[in-house]
């Protein structure tokens, strides 16, 4: 049993990127993923989980920051979607649904970083609700 949950509090492109990421991982090289994470220490994973809300992409896990791991895992997911090779009417594969995640990684800013930046401008909570 695996529970896959969608991301929330984000736009359409973000909502589609979560399931696409999961599908890409499942259709990708599961042995490569297993080889990678089987070496991870449980306590370090828990620590990263607890630190991530405070430190974001700067959180360390197994000697690398979460930005590194996000990029690495996104590349694995892309390979899985390319391997799956399911095309839309425009002959584009499902990797297009990962564009939002790629932008997050390229900009090195999470949705939380953007919200903090908006709030920090004038400390007005209404800024957080404007889209």
Ranges and model annotations:
Residues 1-131:
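C-terminal accessory/tail domains of diverse enzymes
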């Amino acid at each position: 049993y695996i529970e896959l949950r969608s991301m929330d509090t984000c736009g359409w492109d973000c909502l589609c990127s979560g399931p696409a990421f999961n599908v890409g991982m499942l259709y990708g090289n599961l042995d490569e993923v297993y080889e990678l994470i089987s070496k991870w220490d449980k306590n370090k994973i828990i620590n990263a989980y607890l630190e991530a809300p405070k430190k974001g992409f700067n959180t360390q896990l197994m000697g690398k920051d979460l930005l590194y791991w996000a990029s690495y895992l996104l590349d694995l997911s892309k390979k899985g979607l390319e391997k799956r090779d399911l095309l839309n009417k425009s002959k584009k594969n499902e990797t297009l649904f990962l564009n939002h995640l790629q932008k997050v990684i390229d900009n090195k800013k999470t949705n939380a970083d953007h919200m903090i930046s908006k709030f920090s401008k004038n400390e007005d909570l209404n800024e957080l609700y404007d889209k």
